[in-house]
């Protein structure tokens, strides 16, 4: 080290500068949950009819009543009624979709007005 003495002032300057070692870090595994071995399973999704949904709603209501009979403020009771609410919403959406005929507004418009530009179809 070099010291400079001027009028009773000592200033020390180091001759070596230390730099931190840069390390290349790999990706964090938490950001890629699909790469975990335990997550490699298939779940088959099946559409249910409106009748099956209404039966499931009735069954879940009975289960919620039985669950809440002992302790109406428990977490299990809240979860049971949440399931009832979700199934009721699914049944309502199924009824609305059935009422609409299962078609989107453009299809309905094209059925009424097939000569418009939006509804033309071209065959090659």
From Swiss-Prot:
Localisation = Plastid, Chloroplast
Q: Which UniProt keywords apply?
A: Calvin cycle, Chloroplast, Copper, Disulfide bond, Nickel, Plastid, Transit peptide
**Transit peptide (residue range):** 1-47
Q: What induces it?
A: Insensitive to light/darkness, anaerobic treatment and heat, but repressed by sucrose.
Query: What is the tissue localization of expression for this protein?
Result: Mostly expressed in flowers, hypocotyl, cotyledons, leaves, stems, and flower stalks. Barely detectable in roots and siliques. Present in root tips and lateral roots. Accumulates in the cotyledons of etiolated seedlings.
- Is Zinc-finger among this UniProt entry's keywords? no
Map out region (Disordered) in residue numbers: 90-124
Instruction: Enumerate the InterPro entries for this protein.
Output: CP12-like, CP12_dom
What this protein is called in its record is: Calvin cycle protein CP12-1, chloroplastic
Species, as recorded: Arabidopsis thaliana
Q: What is the lineage of its organism?
A: Eukaryota, Viridiplantae, Streptophyta, Embryophyta, Tracheophyta
């Amino acid at each position: 080290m070099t010291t400079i003495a001027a009028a009773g002032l000592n200033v020390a300057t180091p001759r070596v500068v230390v730099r931190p070692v840069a390390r290349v870090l790999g990706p964090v595994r938490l950001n890629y949950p699909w790469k975990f071995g335990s997550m490699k399973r298939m779940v088959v999704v099946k559409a249910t009819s409106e009748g099956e949904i209404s039966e499931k709603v009735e069954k879940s209501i009975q289960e919620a009543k039985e669950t809440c009979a002992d302790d109406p403020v428990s977490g299990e009771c809240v979860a049971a009624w949440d399931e009832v609410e979700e199934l009721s919403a699914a049944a309502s959406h199924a009824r609305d979709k059935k009422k609409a005929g299962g078609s989107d507004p453009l299809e309905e418009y094209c059925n009424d007005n097939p000569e418009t530009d939006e509804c033309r179809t071209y065959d090659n």
